[in-house]
Every structure is written in C-alpha cells, then in structure tokens.
C-alpha cells in the first residue's frame, strides 16, 4: 500500500489533474500527469470488469508504483487508469507498460 502522503484523495485533486494534465496511453494503462507534489491516483472503471478484476487492476498498478517510487520525479501528480485490456495480464506486462509510459512522459529520474 502506498503511504497516505503519496495518494490523491480529493475529488478536486483528480479534477485538476484531468483538466490541466497531459495524457498518455499504452495497451493496458492510460495516465494523466501534472506538475505538483508527488501523488498518485488509480482508477479502474466498470469497463475493466467485475469488482474482482477492477481491484486486481488497481493492485497491480499500485504495486508497480510502490516498487518504483524512488525512480519517479518528485514534482509529478499522476492518475493511472486501467483499460479493459488489463484483464488477465501478468504483473510483468503491466510493469513494462507503466514504466515505458512514464519514460515517454519524462516522469522518471534520469539514471546515470
């Protein structure tokens, strides 16, 4: 579980990221990203499937972020949205998708 300080919790926070943020998408996940304090939100709509599948999708996305938290820039607010294709996908595929998308969005700290 992500610490509370790293979670987007208010509706107004989500609305701000959706309204002003830039969006990127890949096969399994879409993101909205905005400059601001390091915080993350996770969404899985009913298009993903029943509650079991939606919760699994959110857990997969949260786990990727939890393990790679130190690699993400401190001035980013990011909302991850699970797409319908995430059903039945392995953790490794979700991790690969999210990390490639964050790299494309220039949200990762450059490693030397």
Language-model segment annotations:
Residues 1-112:
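Positively charged, solvent-exposed patches that mediate nucleic-acid binding
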């Amino acid at each position: 579980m992500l610490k509370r300080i790293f979670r987007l919790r208010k509706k107004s926070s989500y609305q701000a990221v959706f309204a002003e943020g830039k969006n990127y998408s890949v096969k399994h996940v879409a993101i909205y990203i905005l400059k601001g304090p390091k915080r993350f939100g996770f969404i899985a709509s009913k298009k993903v499937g029943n509650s079991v599948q939606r919760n699994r999708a959110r857990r997969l996305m949260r786990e990727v972020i939890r393990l790679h938290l130190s690699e993400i820039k401190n001035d980013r607010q990011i909302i991850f949205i699970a797409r319908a294709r995430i059903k039945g996908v392995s953790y490794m595929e979700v991790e690969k998708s999210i990390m490639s998308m964050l790299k494309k969005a220039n949200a990762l700290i450059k490693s030397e």
